[in-house]
UniProtKB/Swiss-Prot annotation:
InterPro entries xrefs: DUF624
Keywords: Cell membrane, Membrane, Transmembrane, Transmembrane helix
One Pfam family in the UniProt entry: DUF624
Entry keyword annotation includes Transmembrane: yes
Listed name of the protein: Uncharacterized protein YesL
Originating species: Bacillus subtilis (strain 168)
Chief localisation class: membrane
GO cellular component: plasma membrane
Taxonomy of the source species: Bacteria, Bacillati, Bacillota, Bacilli, Bacillales
Bilayer-spanning residue ranges: 21-41, 81-101, 107-127, 159-179
Subcellular locations according to the entry: Cell membrane
Membrane topology of the entry: Multi-pass membrane protein
Length: 209
């Protein structure tokens, strides 16, 4: 009986998380589409990571829609600026890589591939940092860069998690519709949380001193 009860509890816990993630992902997609993607994707992503942050803190009973909608409105402008910077940088890197490849410059291609890899590692932290720290956009980028390379093990785990989610999305469209963004945001937030806590503790010590 005890074993059956344990299995039932585990199954219930699993189903609860599946529903949470699916609901959050649907909100992310709907709000992105409501803003015609261009005007909705970044604030919806910021809102999704804010909900994931609440879950990572253990606040699993947080009102998902209220937190999501409040963040979407509050961070609309800042998240758009942040997204514009990230997307513009990514497009520049992609264009430079294509030009170098067309000019048959393997050394330059390798340089841009290396820069793109560094950029990708930093981007993994951008929205977790944005949702966790109350700082300016410039500081979001500098903190993301600092943590990405001061915590290489965490960064590699985050990259592996992102690749894993991508594989699931490519496996079946169901994962795209219900888990692509929400699962990724939860993985990245949970993994980055330890680094954030150490930074928070350091800031508290500096303030106390």
């Amino acid at each position: 009986m005890l074993m059956i009860h344990s299995v039932a509890n585990g199954l219930n816990h699993f189903c609860t998380w599946v529903m949470r993630l699916a609901y959050l992902n649907v909100l992310w997609i709907l709000f992105s589409l409501a803003g015609l993607v261009v005007f909705g994707l970044m604030p919806a992503t910021a809102a999704m990571f804010t909900v994931a942050r609440e879950w990572a803190k253990g606040n699993t009973d947080a009102p998902v829609f209220s937190v999501f909608f409040r963040t979407f409105k509050k961070e609309w402008r800042a998240s758009q600026i942040l997204g514009l910077i990230v997307v513009t940088a990514a497009l520049f890197l992609f264009a430079d890589m294509r030009i170098a490849a067309q000019m048959d410059q393997p050394v330059l291609v390798n340089v841009f591939v290396s820069i793109s890899l560094i950029f990708a590692f930093v981007v993994l932290y951008v929205f977790p940092v944005f949702s966790h720290f109350d700082v300016k956009i410039r500081e979001v980028l500098s903190i993301s860069f600092f943590i990405a390379f001061s915590r290489p093990a965490v960064t590699l785990l985050m990259a592996a998690g992102a690749v894993g989610v991508l594989c699931l999305v490519l496996f079946h469209v169901t994962f795209l519709l219900f888990f692509s963004g929400s699962l990724l945001s939860l993985i990245l937030t949970k993994l980055s949380f330890k680094a954030f806590r150490s930074m928070d503790q350091r800031q508290e010590k500096e303030k106390a001193a």
